[in-house]
Amino acid sequence: MPALVAPERRRRLLHRLSTVLLVAGVLVLADAGITLVWQEPLTGLQTRVRQHALRGDLKHLEAQGPTAIEAQVLAGLRSEQRRIAFLARSLQRRTEPGAAIGTLKIPRLDTSFVMVKGSDPSDLRKGPGTLDDTPLPGVGGTTAIAGHRTTYLAPFRHIDQLEPGDRITVEMPYATFTYRVQRTRIVAPDAVKVLRDVGYDRLVLSACHPLFSAAQRIVVVSRLTNVVPLRAARLGQGSEFGRTGLSSTAS
């Protein structure tokens, strides 16, 4: 009788083990499927929590207003364009890496994310991040923002679906900037020429390409079409931007 017990125990153990392996396999496949169709769930939850905290930080930043020194400088700037540029440079200078700096909205994709300063891995785990070597909107030139496509809420998951003419809005504490998509390109990771100054203000969104690979980069290039000054940047009615906004025709 004892000789029969051991094989029976082994069969039960093997059955349990096979069940565990089957469940584990299903979970792995489910996670892969979710990542492929939507986004990786665990890192997404982390970023969702961080985004909630960043929204509070951004509201606090907007409510702070300019420092005493900034207010003195602003008093001598009678052009909203110059005031915006000054506030943009000041914000970039005094903001710590990974801190909230503005909001990126892409209506076609129905997305709205708080942006952070910087594009290091730790920064991009919180949301889209500005590239340090590019100016903030309002300074002039090409502003670049990087983001993930498959993890950490995948803010740029569907940027390949953007079409020429689509609107992208960047809300900064000092102004709201509207861009219109010009084109989408696939480039090498070291193709820094896409960030060069081309003589007018642009926004470049950048992410790894293809999905689940860092072999290339997908970049969406947009042109600035309108600026609405906010808070300390405003001069009131009759101002340079306040009357008509800053507009141009996207090419």
Predicted features, each with a name:
Residues 9-10, 15-251:
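Solvent-exposed, non-transmembrane regions of membrane-associated and secreted proteins
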